[in-house]
Amino acid sequence: MRLALWMYQGTAHHGVGRIANSMRGVHAVFHAPQGDDYVNPIFTMLERTPDFPRMTTSIVSGRDLAQGTVRLPETLRQVDAQVQPDLIIVCASCSTILLQEDLERMAHSAGTRAETLVYDANPYRMQEVRSADGLFTLLTQRFARSQPPTAVPSVNILGPASLGFHNRSDLICLRRMLATLGVQVNVVAPLGASIRDLERLPAAWATIAPYRELGQNAARWLDEQFGVPALTDSPIGVQPTLRWLRRLVETLNDAGERLQRLTNPLRLPPLTAFSLDGMSAPSSVPWFARTADMESYSMKRAFVFGDATHTVGMVKFLRDELGMQIVGAGTYLEHEADWVRGELQDYLPADETGSIDTSFLVTEVFQDVARRIADLTPELVCGTQMERHACRKLDLPCMVIAPPTHIENHLLSYRPVLGFDGADVLADTVYTTATLGMEKHLIDMFGDAGLEYEEPRTERREAEFGNQKVETGEPGTGAPVIAHADSNGGVAGSSSTLAAQTVTASPRLVTPVWAPEAQAMLKKVPFFVRGRVQKNVERYAAQHGYATITAEILVEAKEALGG
């Protein structure tokens, strides 16, 4: 297990907490030291619900270990008496699992009324996503019972969960589309489900599981054990939603014929029936993408990074429906990397061998993603909360499309990602996130009108080489500084000469600086590509041994780079 400042996934017992907090009549008890009770505040901070998190930490202290005492049985009895759950899930945290204690024996000795399940959420083998999905699959296998099918077409919706990315809004959107088709919802799980609801899962005609991260393994098991077909596509975007609806109708008609329960086959109603007012088009994306504003996006470059479901869905939405260029994508879910790579094979830039490995990134290290973004400098980044932080430093527009997220992505309002409504939300977010730039263009042309906008930071940049930092601009002034290494390995500066120079010291220790006339030319470049032009010219100057970038070198670099 790797420790870091930021991690894309929570620990294994955080995944257990997500399932317990999603369900009714289920409570999680963590056998953990005081420091591992951070999971509770995460839910109280982010989850917009009036209830307390359905989890309790049974503290393990150094005194307990020294005296050979265990608090877990007493904690289980207290939870059983006060909360009165139907099921208590017990698991060790990433710290106490090192003790290798017999939690089964401890839980059995508590003698609780509620059923107790000890879940082996080993943090050295799994993290949040696999832990949550594994637990939900286990609960499905444990409690699902053979049931007669419902009298009318019905579906299960598996996957929405506590702290899921816009899951509550997605659920509303799915319910609306199903109601339009005349299809009932049998069970939604884990969000809002009880143990009794899990028993009723086999009664549905089909199962909808739109998220690869949670619910699809349980859906496949229901198909294998009870013959309930699973629909695992993610309706992200207008065209994927249309395909999803057609496949759902086909699946339910096949199930109805097999079950001999359907007298009149289901049919898709007019598309206007799926709109909010019942009279207009269900989504505005098809016509909006052809407006003058959005057609300009066909020249914009995008980078997408996140979990499996939202990365694939967002890449296809940006390219297929908004016409943007995808310069790179990736995921932090290593166990889903092969599926994501296969889905994006025709969407990412390939090398001469046809491989997309150079443009596809699989990593759990957020610094690697930040470096890739800095190298590509796209006009739009779609990522997680970590990419949002990285892009703020790089002054690049970023929209959050996948967990991990912060409080602003757990909204009270209706903001789905799935379905026709989700397509409109995504298009709006892209449009309001990507920079149009009219304000900055006007400031460049007419001045700031006394508003004191900051100048683009072209004359002061820091370059870090190993443990050394080279200041390439005088703080608070526009005077460029020629940086070079002194005899002791330090860095000295001089602003005396602005002519082009050949670097005689190690090129690793010198960053080219901009002469005033070159800076003036750079400011004439539209701001939304200015950063990329600056970086390319600086790279060209460093490769050719120029310590100072003059107007002549800027023109030379532009011609050499094909600009």
Swiss-Prot record:
SUPFAM superfamilies linked: Helical backbone' metal receptor
Species lineage: Bacteria, Bacillati, Chloroflexota, Chloroflexia, Chloroflexales
Species name: Roseiflexus castenholzii (strain DSM 13941 / HLO8)
UniProt gene name: bchB
Role: Component of the dark-operative protochlorophyllide reductase (DPOR) that uses Mg-ATP and reduced ferredoxin to reduce ring D of protochlorophyllide (Pchlide) to form chlorophyllide a (Chlide). This reaction is light-independent. The NB-protein (BchN-BchB) is the catalytic component of the complex.
Catalytic residues (UniProt): D293
Protein name per its UniProtKB record: Light-independent protochlorophyllide reductase subunit B
GO biological process: light-independent bacteriochlorophyll biosynthetic process; photosynthesis, dark reaction
Manner of cofactor binding, per the entry note: Binds 1 [4Fe-4S] cluster per heterodimer. The cluster is bound at the heterodimer interface by residues from both subunits.
Binding site for [4Fe-4S] cluster: D36
Broad enzyme group: oxidoreductase
Catalytic reactions of this protein: chlorophyllide a + oxidized 2[4Fe-4S]-[ferredoxin] + 2 ADP + 2 phosphate = protochlorophyllide a + reduced 2[4Fe-4S]-[ferredoxin] + 2 ATP + 2 H2O
